[in-house]
């Protein structure tokens, strides 16, 4: 008799499926999230793995790159940044006219290219203007021999200039370099205008007190056309006392308009070359009248009886 051998296989031990699936999921998750974490780290540091220079997704480069400076000290600004600077400096200049940084910012942000191009054409059409653009002189205490100016006769431009500097306690070195005008030559033209400002005070005798500054600004605007000067003449008097506005509107504005419109272009004056010239002769040649002494008018106002000098400065 044959023994019957069971065909049933022997029982095998089945592994727990969870013991395989769970570690696999953990490993897969670790791989995925580890990669995501590394990617996030690179995104945070600005270093993604797109190294193809032709790739449009290469974010190693900044999202927006600033233009390269066109000259030493130049700070390129886009249109929105210039608009913000103009708005902020306008408010700052009105509230704090003594703060030079607001005046500087307002001047450069409103020095529109068409205005400077017009001045450029004006200079290029004049022999002296062309010489200034070619040589690009700077008005500083180093370029001007201040001790020599003190030795000049009292009736000369150089003597009037140094006397005005000493009387007002200012220096030619107080004019900061232009930074926010993009074109190099236009930046120099504005720098030249800025550095010549004290000569306009000197030939007119106007002091640096607020009324004198406003009067010179109106003269500059009517002759040179710098927008900031016009804005100063328009809005600065609003902060003055009634008597100060009366002096400006009644005496110095008519003088500034007449002299500015009748005078030859002040931007074409090579001041460094005419320091020994008679100042009265210069005024006649240019067509500039000397205004009344502002400080003397203020002194007379203060000597008036109290009811008559009400609101005087």
UniProtKB/Swiss-Prot annotation:
InterPro entries (alphabetical): Coq4, Coq4_euk
Cell location: Mitochondrion inner membrane
Regions annotated as coiled coil: none
Catalyzed reaction equations: a 4-hydroxy-3-methoxy-5-(all-trans-polyprenyl)benzoate + H(+) = a 2-methoxy-6-(all-trans-polyprenyl)phenol + CO2
Residues binding Zn(2+): 197-198, 201, 213
Feature: compositional bias, Basic and acidic residues: 303-313
Pathway(s) annotated for this protein in UniProt: Cofactor biosynthesis; ubiquinone biosynthesis
Membrane topology (UniProt): Peripheral membrane protein
Cofactor(s) required, per the database record: Zn(2+)
GO term, biological process aspect, one: ubiquinone biosynthetic process
Keywords of the record: Lyase, Membrane, Metal-binding, Mitochondrion, Mitochondrion inner membrane, Ubiquinone biosynthesis, Zinc
Major subcellular site: mitochondrion
Pfam families to which the protein is assigned, alphabetical: Coq4
GO CC annotations on file: extrinsic component of mitochondrial inner membrane
Subunit comment: Component of a multi-subunit COQ enzyme complex, composed of at least COQ3, COQ4, COQ5, COQ6, COQ7 and COQ9.
Biological role stated in the UniProt entry: Lyase that catalyzes the C1-decarboxylation of 4-hydroxy-3-methoxy-5-(all-trans-polyprenyl)benzoic acid into 2-methoxy-6-(all-trans-polyprenyl)phenol during ubiquinone biosynthesis.
Family per record: Belongs to the COQ4 family.
Protein name per the record: Ubiquinone biosynthesis protein COQ4, mitochondrial
Organism, as annotated: Meyerozyma guilliermondii (strain ATCC 6260 / CBS 566 / DSM 6381 / JCM 1539 / NBRC 10279 / NRRL Y-324) (Yeast)
């Amino acid at each position: 008799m044959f023994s019957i051998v069971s065909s049933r296989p022997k029982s095998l031990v089945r592994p727990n499926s969870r013991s395989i699936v769970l570690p696999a999921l953990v490993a897969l998750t670790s791989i995925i999230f580890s990669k995501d974490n590394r990617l996030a780290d690179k995104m945070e540091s600005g270093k993604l793995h797109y190294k193809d220079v032709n790739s449009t997704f290469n974010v190693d480069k900044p999202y927006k790159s600033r233009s390269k400076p066109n000259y030493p000290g130049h700070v390129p600004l886009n249109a929105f940044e210039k608009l913000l600077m103009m708005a902020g400096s306008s408010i700052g200049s009105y509230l704090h006219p003594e703060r030079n940084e607001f005046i500087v910012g307002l001047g450069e942000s409103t020095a529109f290219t068409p205005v400077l191009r017009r001045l450029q054409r004006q200079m290029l059409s004049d022999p002296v203007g062309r010489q200034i653009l070619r040589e690009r002189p700077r008005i500083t205490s180093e370029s001007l021999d201040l001790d020599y100016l003190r030795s000049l006769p009292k009736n000369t431009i150089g003597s009037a200039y140094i006397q005005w500097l000493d009387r007002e306690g200012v220096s030619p070195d107080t004019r900061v370099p232009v930074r926010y005008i993009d074109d190099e030559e236009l930046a120099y033209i504005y720098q030249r205008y800025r550095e010549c400002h004290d000569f306009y005070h000197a030939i007119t005798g106007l002091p640096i007190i607020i009324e004198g500054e406003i009067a010179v600004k109106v003269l500059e605007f009517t002759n040179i056309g710098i927008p900031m000067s016009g804005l100063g003449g328009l809005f600065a008097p609003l902060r003055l006392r009634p008597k100060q506005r009366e002096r400006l509107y009644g005496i110095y504005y008519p003088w500034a308009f007449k002299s500015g419109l009748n005078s030859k272009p002040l931007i074409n004056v090579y001041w460094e070359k005419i320091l020994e010239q008679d100042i009265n002769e210069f005024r006649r040649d240019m067509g500039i009248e000397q205004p009344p002494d502002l400080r003397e008018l203020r002194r007379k106002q203060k000597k008036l009886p109290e009811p008559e000098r009400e609101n005087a400065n």
